[in-house]
UniProtKB/Swiss-Prot annotation:
The lineage of its organism: Eukaryota, Metazoa, Chordata, Craniata, Vertebrata. This is Required for drug-induced death protein 1. It comes from Rattus norvegicus (Rat). Residues 1-95 are annotated as: Disordered. Regulates drug efflux through modulation of ABCB1 localization and activity. Keywords: Membrane, Transmembrane, Transmembrane helix. It is a single-pass membrane protein. It comes from the Eukaryota. One of its GO terms (biological process) is regulation of response to drug. One of its GO terms (cellular component) is 9+0 non-motile cilium. Coiled coil: none annotated. Residues 29-53 have a biased composition (Acidic residues). It is found in: Membrane.
Length: 140
């Protein structure tokens, strides 16, 4: 038996579903109320028996403008416990140390390359004139 045939037979054996894709049980009042409300929205909007307010919606239907407010307690208690004070300081110190090392390396390499560049510029400038150039090696 192929996969498609198995799925077809399984789908045909399933219990029929309601109009909204949910199983409807007899006596389920909440589901019945929701379905009746949703099916009621499918009515003809131009029907005579629906009373409308001045903004174009049915009387008694909730609108998006209605705001529900809830009273908050006097004192707010956070759900998360604050972290101890010494941990961020250690982490911050480690980051500063790491960045300091990297900046120090960049400056020393940059200084070395600047000295090499200046020596090359001096050699190129003085070479046409036949003046001997002394190259001083830059050692840290």
């Amino acid at each position: 038996m192929t996969v498609g045939a198995r799925l077809r037979s399984k789908a045909s054996s399933l219990v029929g579903r309601g109009p909204l894709g949910r199983l409807r049980r007899a006596g389920d009042e909440e589901t019945d109320a929701i379905v009746e409300h949703l099916e009621g929205e499918d009515e003809d909007p131009e029907s005579q028996d629906c009373e409308r307010e001045e903004d174009g919606r049915r009387a008694g239907t909730p609108s998006a403008r209605r705001v529900h407010l809830a009273a908050l307690p006097e004192r707010y208690d956070s759900l998360e416990e604050p972290a101890p004070g010494d941990k961020p300081k250690k982490r911050y110190r480690r980051k500063l140390k790491k960045y300091g090392k990297n900046v120090g390396k960049a400056i020393s390499k940059g200084c070395r390359y600047i000295v090499i560049g200046l020596q090359g510029f001096a050699a190129a400038y003085s070479a046409p004139f036949g003046v001997a150039t002394s190259v001083v090696s830059f050692v840290r």
